[in-house]
């Protein structure tokens, strides 16, 4: 059944593109865990000192952004033909905003950039999952969703391990 599900995904480009795009996002998603920790340890967020509190504030901005993006763009989900474009734009936006994080002075602006970057990530996550559900027959949905999650978790795990190894060297 698993191999039949993989075959189904590969034969349907409108499904495989979404599954592979989410997997590609995960290549940086795992390493990003360390990035937020490093920034949180060194950034100055005003009254909040660096260290554990700084890490917590960054992850708070990340979490709020991840919820904010899909809520704000929810009305756009009714237009299915726009969804692939919104997914692409939001993935690109998330990446560009992290380029901004790399260029900005680590402080309050970092929180704003992380918030909006993860707003974009949340949009791509919710829209791509919804689009997969709409495009996949019920008979195949479990295998498609399972493969989607397998690719994401495996890729994020490898990305996290690689980033940890790079930081140790």
Segments from the language model and where they lie:
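Juxtamembrane intracellular "pre-TM" segments in multi-pass secondary transporters
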Residues: 1-20
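C-terminal transmembrane bundle of multi-pass solute transporters/carriers
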Residues: 3, 41-169
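Aromatic side chains
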Residues: 8, 32-34, 59, 98
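Transmembrane helix irregularities
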Residues: 9-10, 27, 103, 136
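Short coil/turn helix-boundary motifs
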Residues: 9-13, 30, 79-80, 154
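Alpha-helical transmembrane segments of multi-pass integral membrane proteins
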Residues: 15-25, 84-87, 109
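Conserved extracellular-gate-facing transmembrane-helix segments in secondary transporters
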Residues: 21, 25-36, 121, 156
């Amino acid at each position: 059944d698993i191999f039949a599900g993989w075959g189904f995904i590969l034969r349907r480009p409108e499904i495989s593109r979404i599954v592979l795009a989410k997997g590609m996002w995960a290549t940086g998603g795992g390493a990003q865990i360390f990035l937020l920790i490093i920034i949180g340890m060194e950034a100055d967020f005003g009254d909040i000192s660096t260290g554990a509190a700084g890490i917590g504030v960054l992850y708070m901005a990340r979490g709020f952004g991840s919820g904010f993006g899909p809520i704000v763009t929810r009305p756009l989900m009714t237009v299915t033909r726009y969804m692939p474009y919104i997914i692409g734009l939001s993935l690109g936006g998330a990446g560009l905003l992290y380029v901004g994080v790399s260029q900005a002075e680590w402080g309050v602006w970092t929180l704003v950039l992380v918030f909006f970057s993860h707003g974009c990530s949340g949009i791509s996550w919710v829209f791509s999952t919804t689009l997969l559900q709409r495009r996949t027959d019920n008979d195949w949905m479990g295998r498609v969703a399972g493969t989607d999650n397998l690719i994401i978790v495996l890729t994020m795990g490898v990305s996290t391990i690689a980033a940890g190894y790079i930081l140790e060297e």
